[in-house]
From Swiss-Prot:
This is Orotate phosphoribosyltransferase. PROSITE patterns: PUR_PYR_PR_TRANSFER. Pathway: Pyrimidine metabolism; UMP biosynthesis via de novo pathway; UMP from orotate: step 1/2. Gene3D superfamilies: 3.40.50.2020. Coiled coil: none annotated. PANTHER family: OROTATE PHOSPHORIBOSYLTRANSFERASE, URIDINE 5'-MONOPHOSPHATE SYNTHASE. The lineage of its organism: Bacteria, Bacillati, Bacillota, Clostridia, Eubacteriales.
Amino acid sequence: MTRDEIVAIFQKTGAMLSGHFRLTSGRHSNRYFQCALVLQHPDYSELLCRELAARFAGDGISVVIGPAMGGIIVSYEVARALGVRGLFAERENGVMTLRRGFSIEPGERVLVVEDVITTGGSVREVMEAVRKSGGTVAGAGVLVDRSNGAVDLGVRTEALLTAEVVSYAPEDCPFCKQGIPAVKPGSRKI
């Protein structure tokens, strides 16, 4: 798929939002990628995740895992495309954990996936959970990298769409200074 084809899917589904947003990282931005609006369409989910999976075909991946909430559908669809298990990690007492009977066997090659990264914090937390379980993080795949490639996860990282989106610390946010309320569209702490 070309970048233009991927952008067209995000535009068609209304997933590229403009306004004043408080991101999961705590930073503020005037742009937000609401991947749930894309992922609600099974055909688009399959298409995008199949493209992401293709970038890791032949890498010996045996498990795909993503953080709840944004990584659940991505994990499932990428795992389906690779013909492997798809798991998700959840926060328990503030720590990303494997729950619901999920496990990773020592030495399994694991692909960590997510819908959107800005700072990479959630992906790093999942990577740590994988390593604590004895798995080997073989790579990371994301639908959208808001850092435009600036985030270094320490493993090969593939993004379907990279975008340089300005974000601000809350104290430096021009929208806050104008008194414009921030919207928190993500899933953390709901």
